[in-house]
């Protein structure tokens, strides 16, 4: 059965499941799922199926309306808490407050020149800062656009991610209180890959 709200930007279910599974710590099941760029809610639906409470937001009111439809369609007889709000990523700490036992799983927005988006990069950095305020012991699992050369997955190569050398991106991640636990490329199509990134707090 198809979801009631769909857009071409919707993330494949297999990638949504992958990102959520990578956000789990050993022998620890998260309670809260937070996505500040929820889009059509593809990742949130997978988290809902896994029994998590859902806290998602988007700046686009069309997406907010659509994801409410999709989550209502997906919830079935489950008793999960679901909250969907229109909100900038820069304000999600004020929106949700402190939430222990959370994971942050998201696919940041980027434009037509996807892997060269400085705006998208700033949104990603804002998400890092806000996540630490909400839960200082959480995990972030996400994907950033990268050039197809990253599929070679040579650890000695400074690949271009979102238009910048990976070393610069990682430095910025560290400066915002996170360390990269995993970095692995995933093929999207011939000329575009996405770099799957999992981050844990530095402390």
What are these regions (language model features)?
Residues 1-203:
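Class I S-adenosyl-L-methionine-dependent methyltransferase catalytic core
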């Amino acid at each position: 059965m198809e979801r009631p709200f769909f857009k071409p930007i919707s993330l494949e279910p297999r990638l949504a499941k992958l990102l959520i599974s990578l956000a789990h710590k050993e022998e620890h099941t998260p309670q809260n799922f937070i996505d500040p760029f929820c889009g059509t809610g593809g990742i949130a639906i997978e988290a809902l199926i896994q029994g998590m409470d859902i806290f998602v937001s988007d700046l686009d009111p069309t997406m907010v309306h659509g994801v409410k439809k999709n989550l209502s369609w997906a919830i079935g007889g489950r008793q999960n808490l679901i909250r969907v709000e229109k909100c900038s990523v820069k304000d999600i700490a004020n929106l949700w407050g402190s939430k222990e036992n959370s994971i942050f799983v998201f696919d940041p927005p980027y434009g037509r020149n996807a892997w060269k988006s400085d705006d998208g990069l700033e949104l990603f950095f804002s998400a890092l800062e806000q996540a630490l305020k909400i839960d200082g012991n959480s995990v972030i699992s996400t994907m950033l656009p990268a050039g197809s050369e990253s599929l070679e997955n040579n650890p000695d190569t400074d690949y271009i991610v979102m238009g910048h050398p990976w070393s610069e991106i990682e430095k910025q991640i560290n400066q915002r209180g996170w360390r990269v636990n995993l970095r692995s490329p995933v093929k999207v199509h011939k000329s575009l890959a996405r770099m799957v990134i999992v981050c844990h707090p530095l402390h």
